[in-house]
Amino acid sequence: SAKRIFRLDLNDPTKSDRWNFIPKCRNDPAFACQVAGMMIGIESRRKTNADPFWGDAEQIALTAILLHIAEVYREKAIPAFAADFLISLGEDGKDAFAKAMENSPSLYAKQAYLAFRQAPIQTRGSILIGLYNKLRPFTLAPARMVTMPPMAEEIEAGCRNIDFSNLRKPGTAIYLV
């Protein structure tokens, strides 16, 4: 039986526990890569005959972004920041993504970007558009709310943070409402 039971409620986020996995990406490229795969649906991608290039390129780009925002925003970083980051790049013809990643305070973000840079220049914009499309659900108000740290009054009311590292421990259950 479950010993640690959590509730993620996207219908009524005020009744939800919180789950923010972005701060744990800081200085952990392997974890950031796993989170990137989870966020863009790597499991469903593996079950298709589609060209793996696009998904792999999106995953390495998102890995770089997660490492960057986890370093810049630390504990305040939430999944929506990844999409916000892409939108903030605007229409800079001189490749704003490249500038941001090359100047990132995260060495690991820079390394992930170097891998992304292996994609042909002509396809990089399309990769980032596809990535934003997959990240957009994280920008919706309910998703933002359930990934933000709880306020003091919410903690007093019983709201808890879900520790990502507990997910593989027996006895942990998360109910998605």
Name each model feature, range by range.
Residues 1-177:
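P-loop NTPase motor domains
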